[in-house]
């Protein structure tokens, strides 16, 4: 239940416990693309979409709003990339791979079963090797989006994880950078560019406001 703080904390504790045990010898095929490369790629895509929209003679409402907002969001995206590059990311990633850290890959409320006595995690189809902060970030973001980015809720989730699996300074910085990147904005722009560029739903228009 995403409205129950008790269930949310149990889910985070279960993730931390899972992360302590999910370690295997690295198989190169399952190593995820480095986050630095991912941000570089996504930022190129944002610039490419901006160029495409600028060159259109007739622009719909979505495209006009996109052009109004892209400078701000692209700045945040490039700043997150710069911060990641200047952080201890490479060292953190190397240590994660050396210890064989495994991520669930899709840790959200749909894949956590809150039982009477225990908590079960299901659907490991998207598992891979990476910094395990990825899982924590994905889960926290999904929950916080549903609660209007409640800072106290975010703090409690972090504490619940930290109590089970202590977070170091590099992991906390990595988590901060992930939250700083405008992921939802990139997804919206990428969806527009990859699908019909002529028809835009009202829902997507609202997301740009």
Please state what every model-predicted region is.
Residues 167-171:
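Helix N-cap / loop-to-helix initiation motif
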Residues 55-60, 191-209:
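Helical subdomain adjoining the active site within ATP-dependent kinase catalytic cores
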Residues 83-134:
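Active-site acidic catalytic loop and adjacent metal/ATP-binding pocket
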């Amino acid at each position: 239940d995403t409205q129950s703080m008790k269930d949310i904390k149990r889910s985070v504790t279960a993730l931390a416990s899972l992360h302590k045990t999910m370690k295997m010898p690295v198989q190169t095929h399952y190593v995820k693309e480095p986050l630095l490369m991912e941000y570089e790629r996504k930022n190129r895509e944002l610039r490419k979409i901006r160029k495409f929209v600028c060159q259109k003679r007739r622009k719909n409402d979505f495209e006009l709003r996109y052009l109004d907002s892209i400078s701000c969001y692209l700045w945040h995206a490039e700043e997150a990339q710069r911060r990641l590059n200047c952080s201890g990311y490479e060292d953190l990633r190397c240590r994660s791979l050396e210890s064989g850290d495994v991520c669930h890959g899709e840790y959200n409320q749909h894949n956590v079963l809150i039982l009477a006595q225990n908590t079960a995690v299901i659907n490991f189809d998207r598992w891979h090797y990476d910094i395990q902060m990825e899982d924590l970030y994905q889960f926290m973001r999904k929950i916080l989006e549903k609660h209007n980015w409640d800072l106290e809720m975010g703090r409690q989730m972090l504490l619940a994880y930290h109590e089970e699996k202590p977070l170091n300074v590099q992991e906390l910085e990595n988590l901060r950078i992930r939250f700083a990147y405008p992921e939802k904005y990139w997804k919206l722009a990428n969806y527009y560019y990859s699908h019909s560029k002529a028809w835009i739903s009202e829902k997507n228009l609202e997301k740009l406001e």
